[in-house]
Amino acid sequence: MSGNTYGKLFTVTTAGESHGPALVAIVDGCPPGLEISLADLQHDLDRRKPGTSRHTTQRQEADEVEILSGVFEGRTTGCSIGLLIRNTDQKSKDYSAIKDLFRPAHADYTYHHKYGVRDYRGGGRSSARETAMRVAAGAIAKKYLASQGITVRGYMSQLGPIEIPFKTWESVEQNAFFSPDPDKVPELEAYMDQLRRDQDSVGAKITVVAEGVMPGLGEPIFDRLDAELAHALMSINAVKGVEIGAGFASVAQRGTEHRDELTPQGFLSNNAGGILGGISSGQPIVAHLALKPTSSITTPGRSIDIDGNPVDVITKGRHDPCVGIRATPIAEAMMAIALMDHLLRHRAQNADVKVNTPVLGQL
């Protein structure tokens, strides 16, 4: 199966299935000398791991990462970094009844047609379990970006019909929803409790922000930074849409409103989301992700079996009623991986470029 590697100079390759023995990642291109520890990686993995609240899947995975190579005495060596996370709480018997059925809105049907064989246990390769390795790799990218003065942070901005206004970054890490507004948490909890009683699921929107990004990242024409970010973020399971900056709201804006005017003191707005002409402007890079409702629900759904016969499918097992609740660390990881790749690419070609024009911030 191709398509398992992301990046050009900083690359991340993952392998593994939901119910296999382990998940694996090879991270290549990280410069030598970066201080990195298991704790750096484990922090973000703990933010993503399942079973941390009643609102997520109750599959209990420690998600303890092992560094197999590329790090010596606490520093990267410049060689490939091998990462491993062992699966410890698989319940494959939950899926035996659907091995010859196609779950509605899952990858079962498309994997069957593409490969002629599929691992039906928990979705196999198509499961969001794979994203644990992205988060581990993304933690390396975040550590490197931090050494360059760049931070990547995310939060939930909408769950189902509930819009969540941004208040403080401090609130994001203090609740299970990654909500930036603590006053919204009781409403979110009540909504999820009712959703569970209804045996249904719901979608969400995640916002990711990168601050401290220097101007110049991005490679026109086909490797524009916004196109690369959309690629990276759209590769996350259940993501059905990505916006950069004002995104689809740009349709209703006029040019006098949408254009981000410049003054000697800084930009007056950031509708472009920190990217102009496919190249970073030095403003915060802002992206929004729309995630669909979880397809694995206990309410019967119409489908077919491998012979084309009509069937009703009830998906058993342990599933997230809203995949968006655990998606924030994944979105942060993919943005960080994309930005690190482009930072290294920019330095490889343009490290000696100097201009006298000041770098503007945002007012």
UniProtKB/Swiss-Prot annotation:
FMN binds at residues 125-127, 237-238, 277, 292-296, 318. NADP(+) binds at residues 48, 54. Transmembrane segments: none annotated. One of its GO terms (cellular component) is cytosol. It is an enzyme of class 4 (lyase). It catalyses: 5-O-(1-carboxyvinyl)-3-phosphoshikimate = chorismate + phosphate. This is Chorismate synthase. It comes from Pseudomonas putida (strain GB-1). The lineage of its organism: Bacteria, Pseudomonadati, Pseudomonadota, Gammaproteobacteria, Pseudomonadales. The gene is aroC.
